[in-house]
Swiss-Prot record:
It comes from Methanococcus maripaludis (strain C6 / ATCC BAA-1332). This is UPF0285 protein MmarC6_0247. Belongs to the UPF0285 family. InterPro entries: ATPase_NBD, Methan_mark_12. The lineage of its organism: Archaea, Methanobacteriati, Methanobacteriota, Methanomada group, Methanococci.
Amino acid sequence: MIVVGIDHGTSGITACLMENKTVKSIFKMKRTEINENSFLKELEKHVNLQDIDLMGVCYSMGDGIDKITDINKVENRGVINLEGIGKKVGGGTRVYDEIKSSNIPAIVIPGLHKGVKSMDERFNTLFSHIASPEKISICYNAYKTFGFENFILSDISSNTVTLLIKNGKIFGGFDACVGAVGILHGPLDLELIRNIDSKKITANEAFSKAGVVKVTDSYKGVENTKFEIMSNYKNDKKCKLAVDSLVLSVSMEINSLMFLTPEKNVILAGSIGTWKNPNVSEMIKENIDGNVLVLNGESGAIGSAMIAEDILNGKKEILGISVDF
């Protein structure tokens, strides 16, 4: 059985090729690269496309579907629209359309939004959207890897999204624009709201630079800013303050969900959550009274492949989300 998982992230598209539960290869294409190159031609370097049994696809916010759905049943790529979601480059759209037109069997993973009825209704009342599709993939990877039925998952990268899993189902959580900051994205504070009202910037522009990048002079685009900030942690005061502030913010978000999970299992993921120097996970552990573990690797792409494989094996529900395939 050969499956492929796709993670549509802020800085690029990551693909995982898995055969019989074993990861065979992983590759990443920057979003700017995809505009000049075919994703499927790159994938073909790793596998005969006709041998693929199923692909698990993440695209954008995933707020137009509420089930894990056969790509041929999905309208408008599974989104309501592309407004208000951060900087748009177009690479993810091209990959999605390539996959759909290829006739390779594929499922599209939804985001977590108020239409997903398996979540606690209080979270759906509070927030219209909680997470983009790859966060479900990361959660499923963590669920399969560590075997916990109850845990908090915090994915820390360009943005931070923290989710709570109870009894093997996603219970709720905090989206990138609500709680903790990431490197690029974050919630809007008073100053940003005033700048929006005075039409100095749009709300989307504010969100796109409301992360700890605002502390520094280190913006290098969506693909390179995190490397600039993290690599200068020890020799640039602003970069150090940025990372220390991010750690505080994420720790606050995780702790805010801790009372809902007595087991106190916490799993950190994402490029920043797994960053070794500085060791972000150890910094967060100092602020958390719980069992803190790290999910290394390209967790979203691997999780998407795991979802595809288990659906082929007959699973009709993933973390509480129904399957229509």
